[in-house]
Curated annotation (Swiss-Prot):
Coiled coil: none annotated. Binds 1 NAD(+) per subunit. SMART domains: AdoHcyase (SM00996), AdoHcyase_NAD (SM00997). InterPro entries: Adenosylhomocyst_ase-like_sf, Adenosylhomocysteinase-like, Ado_hCys_hydrolase_NAD-bd, NAD(P)-bd_dom_sf, S-Ado-L-homoCys_hydrolase_CS. The gene is Ahcy. It comes from Mus musculus (Mouse). Substrate binds at residues 57, 131, 156, 186, 190. This is Adenosylhomocysteinase. The modification Phosphotyrosine is found at residue 193. The modification Phosphoserine is found at residue 183. Its EC number is 3.13.2.1.
Amino acid sequence: MSDKLPYKVADIGLAAWGRKALDIAENEMPGLMRMREMYSASKPLKGARIAGCLHMTVETAVLIETLVALGAEVRWSSCNIFSTQDHAAAAIAKAGIPVFAWKGETDEEYLWCIEQTLHFKDGPLNMILDDGGDLTNLIHTKYPQLLSGIRGISEETTTGVHNLYKMMSNGILKVPAINVNDSVTKSKFDNLYGCRESLIDGIKRATDVMIAGKVAVVAGYGDVGKGCAQALRGFGARVIITEIDPINALQAAMEGYEVTTMDEACKEGNIFVTTTGCVDIILGRHFEQMKDDAIVCNIGHFDVEIDVKWLNENAVEKVNIKPQVDRYWLKNGRRIILLAEGRLVNLGCAMGHPSFVMSNSFTNQVMAQIELWTHPDKYPVGVHFLPKKLDEAVAEAHLGKLNVKLTKLTEKQAQYLGMPINGPFKPDHYRY
């Protein structure tokens, strides 16, 4: 059935608007354009049937059309019920690429959309491009008969990578995977600089709140937390960090942030942002101690960090202010403003990361798909990384757009350092 369904989107009439947005984004995504220049003729992904489960945004549309330009067949769903940009989905559908995504899916519709991507006209999927692990998990649990035909998985985000390593340790991962998230040009750019801009965009569009002078609590000080903390401090907030890792906690303290527990911070904060990728970060006892009209949001992948169930069961009243903005009246008389139902605030309430930084991430995705498809012998079942040389190539593809001029090593300097004159310039264990 699924191979006969060309698409399901909110409104195909939005395609012209989506195409204009794609045209602008392409000019901000030099890495993906470089991929097209290098590989459109040779089509290294010819024969690949890629099922993609990743936020259906304008930037993702540029990724999808790059994969198609490189020879792949693609079917797509979003990895979040609120993250689809309907004009982008319409543009992809209009281009003849099967896409099943719209903003505001139910959980049942979300699963249905993923299932529409599993079968192509010439057979089932043979590659996975995932963000968060929902597609990977679905095939391993519900459609294991498809696993033998799948050559590889490329995983976009921290949560999905955790899932892959958990599957590997439990002996249930059956397909080779590349951890795209931990490419330096992904985690140190998308996670940090992307969140530094898109978090504020989401909070401002949702609430119009003045951030200066407020107390902001950021749960987690990984790359995402670092970007969020920088952004909030840049707007004039006093930022408090919560952390479990002593190294990250020390980093936060050395940057001048107060570091304490959520049990303490919940009494002080006006704005709360969870960034951990873990469960049970903000619970009922924290809500009960928050200030009136505290704003609570999440920028981790899943909606498990904030106990939304507690709010729904214990609030006296829930008032929807506008899409993805809800105000809960607690029994103590105070109110809580929850954004995007505890899901990704930057995509639920705004447009996600800017195109330029997503070009870094998605160029890694394209390279990972090419590697897995063309060199399956190099990647046994397990979780792998892209080679350092490719990571550096992703960065170099973006320098011209920023008018960056690289210094070149001389032969003498390269010999002195004991490295190739054209890199790689750092060992794999270097942390940047």
